[in-house]
Amino acid sequence: MATTLYTNKVWCVYILRQDNGKLYTGITSNLNRRIKQHSNKQGAKCLRNATNLRLVYHSASAYDYNTAARMEYNLKRKCSKYFKLRLIKAKPLLLHKFLLANKL
């Protein structure tokens, strides 16, 4: 397999909270850089008008791109806000174990 931008890094899943209480879920291979991008209005379009973004959860940087993207998809499409709030409160370092324990 050829080494690419996606395969030669480790990835994490993160959740940001906006002032209005909305949650944003994303993945990155460099959490500090990504948070700065969001803060400088260079990140996701849905966050460009957001102020005071707070990092409320991040997993360990222990996943390949495909695994992190799959977990992000599951959190965005299959999980309620209530589930995400439970995740934030639990703060599991290994997100995949939390998702497996909750049958996701």
Curated annotation (Swiss-Prot):
Query: What Pfam families does this protein's entry cite?
Result: GIY-YIG (PF01541)
Which CDD domains does this chain map to? GIY-YIG_UPF0213
Concerning Gene3D superfamilies, the annotation shows:
GIY-YIG endonuclease
Give the family from UniProt.
Answer: Belongs to the UPF0213 family.
Signal peptide residues are: none
Please name the InterPro entries in this protein's record: GIY-YIG_endonuc, GIY-YIG_endonuc_sf, UPF0213_domain
Q: Name the source organism.
A: Autographa californica nuclear polyhedrosis virus (AcMNPV)
- Mind telling me what this protein is named? UPF0213 protein in VLF1-GP41 intergenic region
Q: Which domain of life is it from?
A: Viruses
**Organism classification, top ranks?**
Viruses, Viruses incertae sedis, Naldaviricetes, Lefavirales, Baculoviridae
Q: Which residues form the GIY-YIG domain?
A: 9-89
